[in-house]
């Protein structure tokens, strides 16, 4: 049996219900009383924030068990940012007010006291050497089944006891899951027998590598060619030339994530008269060997599905049988090469000085660095931060969301699979009506002064030209262990609905997410006027929709009911 000295137990007594991260943030802990200087912990303001300043305390075992702990017995170790994950604050694309402020919420597993984790691989857990190390740890246990821990210092006497990993639930705030989910799979849909299905051409993007199932050793070159094709380019453009300062007006950085940087600007209409004036530039580094923002850079094979899905969902604006403006408009995609332009660096530094950036300084990029730049139409504030006039506005916003999903289902077997409030953008509009086409029928909705846009297809599933694109979440256990908000119940409900087969088309997942959005419209979104008769009347309508939403099998089914369609 592992024994810990009474001195150490006394040290843990006051904070025995707190994890080490809480102790770092609590000024009343014993560490503070010992005058140990803690690192500054920065409150996060960014669109996709993570706990980049997480650390843990290592307590060396005293030479004499009865001697009290001293300052020399403790040291601060900075935890690796690449393994530090958190739920982010809600997205905020623009606006004049300050960005939404959120508490730090680390997403890691808490290691048992007295055990040290390393990244060494071993073939069998029973054959691993087990040791004791007296430490208080805050570490991330890698979810890969091929990796296990190798512990040091004091060997346990009994190796016959079963050692099991404990996966505690993780309490989080609602928002975007920061951890990169690069498990996009493209598979050919075919009705042939099982043998032929195994041999079909497909590729799996996982762990930042392209895993090939059949004869695609040259696929990386083909992915680059495909990206260039969607960019309408033959070769990468010089970064400085493609985005010269005089071509962009009122540029400012509005957010960031592990994927890269987000800038908002206006196009110089004299230079490009046919372009949208108010745009968002999403700049994503590609194919470099340098680890950026704690993660490996995306490959061509990983950025290609995002480009394809974004373009296809945008194309629904002009489709004849099923059309909607409810998905974000992508104006242009560019592949550029070279160092970050100086004017972008100045904007990055201004953002860092005012709000604090968690990303690496873009001066790290060299002359040969590649970037994908997605130019998207600015579409307003996310639903979590938007303030509705009353529930009448939010009710008609719900109708826009339902119809957009229904159109996506009909045209591309679309499932969003991550429709939290940060992925729904809303802006005011002077248009009285929203027009769309559903199953060749023209529909006109009242806008009530708001226009809704759905964004972010990281977890989405679509069928395009007999190919299915989806993100395989079957091995991402951390996502399904999270608690603290209905959002994380929805991920588990999706997994049950799909039976963990993420390639299958099950539009019920859209209904599950609609139930989540309806709950948030009732409980979380902001309203200006809540004491009016109109507000109370439409709150009742939204409650009625909440009571029946789970009876529908798809957004199409729901739209048929709401708009009395056949």
Curated annotation (Swiss-Prot):
GO biological process: intracellular signal transduction; mitotic cell cycle; positive regulation of maintenance of mitotic sister chromatid cohesion, centromeric; positive regulation of maintenance of sister chromatid cohesion; positive regulation of protein localization to chromatin; post-translational protein modification; protein phosphorylation
Documented EC number(s): 2.7.11.1
Xref: PROSITE patterns: PROTEIN_KINASE_ATP (PS00107), PROTEIN_KINASE_DOM (PS50011)
InterPro entries xrefs: GSG2_C (IPR024604), Kinase-like_dom_sf (IPR011009), Prot_kinase_dom (IPR000719), Protein_kinase_ATP_BS (IPR017441)
Catalytic reaction equation(s): L-seryl-[protein] + ATP = O-phospho-L-seryl-[protein] + ADP + H(+); L-threonyl-[protein] + ATP = O-phospho-L-threonyl-[protein] + ADP + H(+)
GO MF assignments: ATP binding; histone H3T3 kinase activity; protein serine kinase activity
Name assigned to this protein: Serine/threonine-protein kinase haspin homolog
Gene source species: Drosophila melanogaster
Gene that this polypeptide is encoded by: Haspin
């Amino acid at each position: 049996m592992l024994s810990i000295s009474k001195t150490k137990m006394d040290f843990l007594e006051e904070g025995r219900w707190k994890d080490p991260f809480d102790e770092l943030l609590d000024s009343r802990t014993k560490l503070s009383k010992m005058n140990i200087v803690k690192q500054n912990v920065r409150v996060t303001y960014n669109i996709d924030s993570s706990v980049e300043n997480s650390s843990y305390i290592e307590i060396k075992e005293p030479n004499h068990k009865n001697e009290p702990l001293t300052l020399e017995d403790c040291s601060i170790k900075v935890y690796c940012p690449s393994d530090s994950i958190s739920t982010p604050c809600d997205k905020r694309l623009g606006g004049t007010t300050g960005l939404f402020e959120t508490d730090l919420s680390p997403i890691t597993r808490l290691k048992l006291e007295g055990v040290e984790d390393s990244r060494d691989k071993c073939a069998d857990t029973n054959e691993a050497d087990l040791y004791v190390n007296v430490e208080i740890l805050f570490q991330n246990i890698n979810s890969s089944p091929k990796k296990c821990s190798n512990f040091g210092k004091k060997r346990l006497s009994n190796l016959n006891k079963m050692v099991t990993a404990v996966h505690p639930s993780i309490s989080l705030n609602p928002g975007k899951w920061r951890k990169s989910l690069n498990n996009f799979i493209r598979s050919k849909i075919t009705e042939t027998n099982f043998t032929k299905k195994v041999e079909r051409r497909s590729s799996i993007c996982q762990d930042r590598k392209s895993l090939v199932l059949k004869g695609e050793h040259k696929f990386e070159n083909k992915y680059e060619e495909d990206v260039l094709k969607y960019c309408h380019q033959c070769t990468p453009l010089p970064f400085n030339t493609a985005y010269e300062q005089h071509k962009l007006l009122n540029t400012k950085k509005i957010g960031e994530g592990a994927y890269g940087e987000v800038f908002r600007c206006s196009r110089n209409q004299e230079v490009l008269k046919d372009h949208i004036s108010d745009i968002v530039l999403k700049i994503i580094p590609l194919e470099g060997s340098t680890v950026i923002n704690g993660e490996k850079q995306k490959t061509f094979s990983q950025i290609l599905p995002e480009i394809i899905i974004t373009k296809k969902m945008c194309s629904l604006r002009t489709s004849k049988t099923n059309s909607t403006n409810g998905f974000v408009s992508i104006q242009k995609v560019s592949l550029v090469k070279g160092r970050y332009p100086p004017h972008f660096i100045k904007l990055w530094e201004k953002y860092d000085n005012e709000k604090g950036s968690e990303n690496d300084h873009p001066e790290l990029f060299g002359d040969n660095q590649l970037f994908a730049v997605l130019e998207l139409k600015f579409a307003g504030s996310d639903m979590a931060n938007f303030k509705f006039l009353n529930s009448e506005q939010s009710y008609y916003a719900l109708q826009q969301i339902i119809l957009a999903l229904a159109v996506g289902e009909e045209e591309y077997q679309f499932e969003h699979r991550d429709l939290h409030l940060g992925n729904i953008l809303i802006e005011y509009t002077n248009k009285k009506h929203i027009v769309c086409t559903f199953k060749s029928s023209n529909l006109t909705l009242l806008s009530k002064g708001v226009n809704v846009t759905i964004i972010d297809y990281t977890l989405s599933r679509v069928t395009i030209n007999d190919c299915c694109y989806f993100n395989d979440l079957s091995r991402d256990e951390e996502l399904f262990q999270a608690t603290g908000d209905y959002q994380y119940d929805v991920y588990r409900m999706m997994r049950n609905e799909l039976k963990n087969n993420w390639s299958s088309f099950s539009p019920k997942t859209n209904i599950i997410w609609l139930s989540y959005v309806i709950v948030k419209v009732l409980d979380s979104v902001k309203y200006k006027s809540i004491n009016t008769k109109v507000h109370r009347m439409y709150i009742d309508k939204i409650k009625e929709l909440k009571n029946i939403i789970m009876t529908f099998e798809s957004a199409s089914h729901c739209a048929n009911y709401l708009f009395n369609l056949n």
